[in-house]
Amino acid sequence: MFQLFRTKWFRSAPVVATIWITLTAGIIVEFNRFVPDLLFHPMSF
């Protein structure tokens, strides 16, 4: 398993970008699931 992380294709830009975007989307989704009011807070006048 650890040898997988040392391979050249795993450190390439598309793979790193895909993992980064997936983690960011997951964090945003989970944050909005637990604190949904902050999603619409700036829109309330």
UniProtKB/Swiss-Prot annotation:
Keywords, ordered alphabetically: Membrane, Photosynthesis, Photosystem I, Thylakoid, Transmembrane, Transmembrane helix
Membrane-crossing residue ranges in chain numbering: 9-29
InterPro entries per record: PSI_PsaJ (IPR002615), PSI_PsaJ_sf (IPR036062)
UniProt record, GO biological process: photosynthesis
Keyword Cell membrane annotated: no
Major localization listed first in the record, in broad terms: membrane
Family annotation (Pfam families): PSI_PsaJ (PF01701)
SUPFAM superfamilies from the UniProt entry: Subunit IX of photosystem I reaction centre, PsaJ
Compartments reported by the entry: Cellular thylakoid membrane
A single cellular component GO annotation: plasma membrane-derived thylakoid membrane
Membrane topology summary: Single-pass membrane protein
Highest rank taxon of the organism: Bacteria
Function recorded in the entry: May help in the organization of the PsaE and PsaF subunits.
Similarity remark: Belongs to the PsaJ family.
This protein's name: Photosystem I reaction center subunit IX 1
Species classification: Bacteria, Bacillati, Cyanobacteriota, Cyanophyceae, Synechococcales
